[in-house]
Regions:
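Transmembrane and membrane-interface helices of multi-pass
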Residues: 2-231
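A diffuse structural propensity rather than consistent per-protein peaks
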Residues: 8, 136-146, 168, 255-256, ...
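Short alpha-helical interface patches
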Residues: 10, 141, 149-161, 169-173, ...
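Alpha-helix initiation and N-capping motif
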Residues: 150-153, 233-236, 240, 307, ...
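Membrane-interface segments at or immediately adjacent to transmembrane helices
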Residues: 215-285
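Solvent-exposed soluble domains appended to multi-pass membrane proteins
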Residues: 270-278, 285-288, 293-645
Length: 645
């Protein structure tokens, strides 16, 4: 090994340029001056030193440089993307997996270039740039850059110039660190005796790294809400998990012929939308955030009835419980199941359809009603970018969309716009409709969103559990009581109108409450549950009410994917072909979600893969049709899944 230290005019020029650039950037980003001075000192030392290492130990020096680069790359990306609070949430194991993943990237580039300097330079810049892209994408739309975004990169680039982005001192720090790392690499001479041996070792180590990442990420889910993916999985790994979950395998027995065979049983002999007896009611759908009846988990007593009005509904009402596919979070999956009739049962755990699988115009109750002349409206009193609704709603076929800026933001309970404000907006839109306008409105509330641990001056807690006190549960129950009052106002208004109106109401999922409270209800909490006990955590109440005469019915259990079919049936609108399939499926498989299905034959909840006989055949047919609708663009059934007209 030889170390040479030589101060030259050219090196001094390089140093001066780097120091001035760092100082200027530091001035505009309010970075600490001691960081700038430290950078200048280290850079001065590196720019004037040259290390020549023994050829026989080249593999060792290369390994050290690559490992340092991988660690620095992962640390830099996490540091830029996360707040200090979120940064420390990432576990050591997750950090190790991300470093190994980054090392695999370095090794692949080394295999291609056979040059350690070039490899470290390219890999470190590429990974850091990748992190910067995610930072700007998050600032632009409120969620992270994922593999699915590559399909719509052109759209993003077309509007990105219209936005102003602000960078802070973190950018400078990681850039300075990257510059020092690259300078270190450039000052070290690493030569390999055999390029072939180096490439063989590189590919073998890459395989080992990839296998390690796979083995340690099999139980992890892609996270797509805000920056959960970065602090729970690490950004690099979360991006790779998104790639994994973007490719859904075709079910066994899938083919165009299999789809056509199933579809053949639901061919239309006349117009699918013959409405000679239809009332063409105004259809209002309310998906209420975290609205649940916790008594399905276990009995408990409160000081007053939580939802007295909803409990009293019976006349002209179909009501009961439906299985959601999510618990405590990931609202859009419930929204999607209702709208399309499809199920999370056949998609990867943790996936979010709105952000991963909607790239064209899926058939839904929205598109079906739009095709028969309905004006379709979506309302959500929160940010348009939440769960990518601003991109998804046009695909679904909504004519009008209303988000947080369209509501009175003084009507707040805790931190969110109230149910009553949303319902007032729905009533206002109804009153503005023309006499011959057929109207469909989907309202997604925000009032009851978790968490429930903070105290608020604008919220009076009126409902509480008798006995042991649980702060979050009491706040949640009080919120439900407020929702019930707003619901009563909505129903009362539409009882008084002459036009036919149908109101569909359901919760998206149960709330995420403390495990001690859940344990009080079911004796176990959230773990060690039987299939029946587990499904109880996924039950949400629903009803379909009309202001005209319909049969009063109770449903013990169904699932959200069937509610749009029930909505059309209660409106006396002829069912499209896919909904007719779902209506028959509902007779065989009364409820199905991401956790399993209800077996009529065995009178219990079971895992989908444990289905046998006729139940297995119907579930398989459902899986085949759903795959056709979501992933087979070339041979998608035009009978079952027509595009918007």
């Amino acid at each position: 090994m030889s170390i040479k230290f030589e101060i030259t005019k050219q090196n001094n020029i390089h140093f001066e340029i780097a120091a001035v650039a760092a100082a200027l950037v530091g001035y505009f980003t309010s970075a600490s001056w001691w960081v700038i001075l430290l950078f200048a000192a280290v850079y001065f030392g590196l720019v004037n030193v040259k290390l020549e290492l023994p050829v026989k130990l080249s593999w060792l020096w290369a390994a050290i440089l690559l490992v340092i680069g991988a660690i620095l790359s992962v640390f830099s990306v996490q540091y830029v993307l996360l707040t200090d609070e979120d940064f420390v949430k990432t576990t050591d194991m997750v950090c190790v997996v991300n470093v190994v993943l980054a090392l695999a990237i370095y090794l692949v580039i080394l295999f291609i270039t056979n040059n350690t300097r070039l490899t470290c330079t390219i890999a470190s810049i590429a990974i850091l740039a990748f992190g910067f892209i995610d930072y700007f994408v998050y600032e632009f739309r409120g969620n992270e850059f994922t593999y699915a975004d590559l399909k719509s990169a052109g759209t993003g680039l077309s509007v990105v110039t219209k936005y102003k982005f602000v960078i802070d001192y973190k950018f400078l720090y990681v850039i300075l660190a990257a510059v020092l790392y690259i300078m270190l690499v450039r000052r070290i001479e690493v030569q390999f005796e055999s390029a072939i041996h180096m490439r063989i070792i590189s590919i073998l180590l890459t395989i080992i790294c990839v296998l390690y990442v796979i083995m340690n990420s099999m139980s992890l889910n892609t996270e797509t809400w805000e920056k959960k993916g970065t602090y729970r999985n690490g950004y690099l790994l979360n991006f790779v998990l998104g790639i994994r979950d973007s490719f859904v395998k075709a079910p066994d027995g899938y083919s165009k012929a299999a789809v056509d065979k199933i579809a053949g049983n639901f061919k239309e002999t006349d117009s699918s939308y013959s409405q000679s007896d239809a009332k063409n009611p105004t259809i209002i759908v309310i998906m209420n955030e975290s609205f649940a009846d916790l008594s399905v988990v276990g009995d408990f007593e409160t000081n007053t009835q939580v939802t007295p009005f909803m409990d009293s509904l019976s006349e002209n009402t179909l009501k009961g419980y439906a299985l959601s596919s999510v618990y405590g979070a990931k609202t859009p999956n419930s929204e999607w199941e209702f709208e399309t009739g499809n199920s999370m049962a056949f998609l990867p755990d943790g996936s979010v359809v709105y952000q991963q699988y909607i790239n064209d115009d899926p058939t839904s109750i929205v598109s079906n009603l739009k095709n028969i002349g309905y004006t379709t409206v979506a309302m959500h009193p929160y940010y348009a970018t939440g769960w990518s609704r601003n991109k998804v709603y046009p695909h679904l076929g909504y004519d009008e969309t209303y988000f947080i800026d369209d509501f009175d933001q003084t009507k707040i309970l805790r931190e969110y716009i109230t149910d009553q404000e949303l319902y007032d907006k729905i009533i206002d839109r109804y009153e503005k409709k023309s006499d011959d306008e057929k109207l469909y409105i989907m309202g997604v509330t925000m009032q009851n969103h978790g968490g429930y641990g903070e105290r608020y001056d604008n919220f009076n807690q009126e409902v509480y559990k008798v006995g042991a006190s649980y702060t979050d549960a009491n706040q949640y129950l009080s919120l439900l009581n407020e929702s019930d009052k707003a619901l009563e106002n909505l129903i009362t208004y539409f009882k008084g109108v002459d036009d036919p109106v149908e109101i569909v109401f359901f919760g998206d999922h149960q709330p995420g409450l403390c495990n001690d409270f859940i344990k009080l209800l079911n004796g176990k909490g959230n773990s060690g549950l039987t299939e029946q006990e587990l499904e109880n955590l996924y039950k949400v109440p629903f009803f379909i009410w009309t202001n005209y005469e319909t049969d009063a019915q109770k449903v013990d259990v169904t699932s959200l994917n069937y509610l749009s079919t029930l909505t059309l049936e209660r409106a006396n609108i002829d069912l499209p072909a896919y909904n007719r399939f779902l209506a028959e499926l509902m007779e065989k498989i009364p409820a199905i979600n991401s956790r399993g299905y209800y077996s009529k034959k065995n009178e219990c909840f079971m895992h989908v893969e444990d289905a046998t006989g006729d139940e297995a055949k119907w579930i398989k047919a459902y899986n085949i049709l759903q795959y056709n609708s979501m992933f087979d663009e070339k041979d998608r059934s035009s009978l079952l899944f027509p595009y918007l007209k």
